[in-house]
């Protein structure tokens, strides 16, 4: 009888260790982020947008990779969008994209090989900032925008600060 108890206790102990081991090994495989953006994660994006953000990744062959993070609060939509593409002539491609900034473009120092910042306001209602830059042969754009023109969380000054932080993060991850 004592022998059966020892065998049963040993079997239960082995089973518990096996299950624990499977949980430790299999757990990280199951616990992955829904968004696989290589340059910025949902937590960082949420901090930049002022609340929990939900990310979406779009990778289509021959097109720029796009990471879009959206944060909704009381009918206000705030979006952080990052696009990255590899260009044969990155300086020319960056210049082409930067034309959308017009005369408003200003150089951003210490971001990638070169970068510009400009307003990205929606004429109808919203407020936004955009960075266009490059790291080696990779051209990137980052836009932070709010659907509310007088957004108390993302004022023009706050947007300028946060777009710079986002640009540091993205350019750093592209190096």
Task: Please name every model-derived segment.
Residues 48, 53-126:
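Short, solvent-exposed recognition patches
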Residues 15-27:
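Bacterial N-terminal signal peptides
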Residues 30, 74-76, 89-91, 140, ...:
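Generic "edge-of-domain/loop-turn" microfeature
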Residues 106-175:
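A short, solvent-exposed beta-edge/loop patch
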Residues 31-70, 104, 147-148, 152-175:
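N-terminal "mature-domain start" segment
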Residues 10-11, 90, 157-159:
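Short alpha-helical segments used as structural interaction elements across diverse proteins
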Residues 1-13:
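N-terminal secretory signal peptides that target proteins for export/translocation
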